[in-house]
Amino acid sequence: MITAQAETFPRRNPFTISRGSKTEARVVTATVSRDGHRGWGEGLPYPRYGETVEAAIAAIRALPEGITRAALQEAMAPGAARNAVDCALWDLEAKSLGRPVWELAGLLPPKPVEIAFTLSLDTAEAMRAAAARNAHRAVLKVKLGTPADMPRIEAVRQGAPKVRLIVDANEGWTPEVYTDLAPHLIRLGVEMVEQPLPQGADDMLAEIARPLPVCADESAHDAASLPGLLGKYDVVNLKLDKTGGLTEALRAKAEARRLGLKVMVGCMISTSLSMAPAVLVAQGADWSDLDGPADMAQDREHPVVYDDRHIHPATPLLWG
């Protein structure tokens, strides 16, 4: 039996990017039950990609009973709905066989992953204070994408002088802004910028110098989308809600490596149930941004554990 329902998890603080703010995560939870075993998974439908919670639930409920992971890849397009079911099927298989998902997927035992902790878009002074509070982290990911970005990133560096930095423009720049800011960001020790231009403007990146590595987020979805990014991007951000689950995320990671692209593994604002499979993909990634539940006022039972610099693999009591 396959079920799907919406659940809402409030955040402690608003999360702001160049496109707006969020105060909660409204996720779709899929459950697959067979032969006395139950697996579950989570997806976060994203309006930026034309997804809604209601449409995702309807699509999941329309799936045939007994669907396999292989059949699922053909039955549903990549996205949050398929992610929820794909991860539920992995969890179901692990529980049915009494073996962990990493073993079923042919992976090595997972280790803690160093992650970037995200600083929400705010005033320069507020971002300086947030950076100072998080100066003990290994990596900070700074949300940008407005005309006033230089004072913000300067303030972040003042607040956290030694931390590694990456920035995310969330489609908010033009080629001229990237070209103007890149030398200053490099001076401040920024390692990489995510999605500086809008999805669909990728070709412009092939026409300019990229002294600061550029990561595709909104422009990178599944493995099939990656060859078209060559010559435009240097890094791809793989999120299970974009790839449509763990199955395709592992394929996309392998394809990125084959193409010579660096890999970042990211997430939406979601719970520990979304992080559990993502940690498996993040093994050996160049960057990981898996702090989705870190500021949740409420999370799943048996949540993933964070320390100052890492996310730890999930307990089987949660998933996998």
Pin down the residues of each PLM region.
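Catalytic core of soluble alpha/beta enzymes
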Residues: 142, 147-283, 297-309
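Active-site cofactor/co-catalyst pockets and adjacent glycine-rich loops in catalytic enzymes
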Residues: 293
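Short helix/strand-capping turn motifs
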Residues: 286-289
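N-terminal capping/lid subdomain adjacent to the active-site entrance of alpha/beta enzymes
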Residues: 1-165, 172-179, 183-187, 300-320
